[in-house]
Design a protein with these regions (language model features):
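Conserved small/polar residues in nucleotide/adenosyl-binding loops
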Residues: 1-2, 211-217
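Auxiliary alpha/beta "docking" domains used to position bulky ligands
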Residues: 2-114, 158
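A short beta-strand-loop-alpha-helix capping motif that often carries His-Thr
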Residues: 62, 186-190
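A short, flexible beta-alpha/helix-coil linker loop
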Residues: 104, 147-148
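SIR2/sirtuin NAD+-dependent deacylase catalytic core
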Residues: 117
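Iron-sulfur cluster-binding cysteine motifs and their immediate structural context
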Residues: 120-143, 149-150, 160-162, 166-184
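Electrostatic cytochrome c docking/interface patches
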Residues: 152-156
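Glycine-rich phosphate/pyrophosphate-binding loop
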Residues: 189-213
Length: 218
């Protein structure tokens, strides 16, 4: 399944802002939220079919989530290596409910849609981490660096302190995607009111109280 997650900061920050946080990290931990949603769905299915067995996963099993989503007709892999959906763009969160029963029918991959000749995500990446083969160079990706405990110092972070939405914020599908409608995905605070100095003076326990992120050490 996919869950749209675009919020008011998904379209980007002011150019001179120096404490940017990826929009997904501004919310409550989506792993727990989506797993709870899948659990509720499984409960309804079990009410109709008591013998049904299954298990929910959200980044918690070695499943090729993006490829499964493509095969299910939910979207395609964009140039920035993320799943892109026709309605919600790439600001979506993935979860799976694996069951021991066959379905009456299965969806097929989408046809006639994709990124075409668009290269906005490639051009938007401040470090050139978006490759031409729908892959990311993790050595140059700001998001990869800032979610590690000891981020490398050899790349400029362009004001990002956790994650990076640069390649997504320029995507035409994302620009016209609607904002999410579920309160569980609302930002827990306004990062624009937090200057870099406030984050630098903050203990880890306090940062976790604002969101589920853990700021990397320097």
């Amino acid at each position: 399944c996919i869950r749209d997650s675009k919020n008011g900061l998904s379209d980007g920050y002011p150019d001179d802002f120096r404490a940017k946080i990826a929009s997904y990290a501004l919310t409550a931990d989506y792993h727990a939220t989506i797993k709870g949603m899948l659990g509720d769905l499984f409960g309804r299915l079990r009410a109709a079919e008591p013998a049904l067995a299954g298990r929910a996963f959200v980044d918690s099993a070695p499943l090729v989530e993006k490829q499964l989503a493509v095969e299910a007709g939910l979207g395609w892999i964009g140039r920035q290596s993320l799943l892109v959906t026709p309605r919600f763009g790439s600001f979506v969160l993935l979860g799976e409910l694996v069951l021991d029963a066959a379905c009456d029918r299965y969806d097929e991959p989408l046809a006639g849609v994709g990124c075409g000749s668009c290269r906005r995500c490639v051009e938007a990446c401040p470090t050139g981490a978006v490759c031409n083969d729908r892959a990311i160079d993790a050595r140059r990706c700001i998001s990869c660096h800032t979610i590690e405990r000891t981020p490398a110092a050899e790349i400029a972070l362009d004001g990002w302190i956790f994650g990076c939405d640069a390649c997504q914020s320029r995507c035409p599908y994302n620009l016209r995607a609607p904002l999410h409608l579920h309160p569980a995905f609302d930002p827990l605070f306004d990062p624009l009111s937090f200057p870099p100095e406030r984050w630098l003076a903050m203990e880890e326990a306090e940062s976790v109280s604002y969101t589920h992120l853990t700021l990397p050490t320097t």
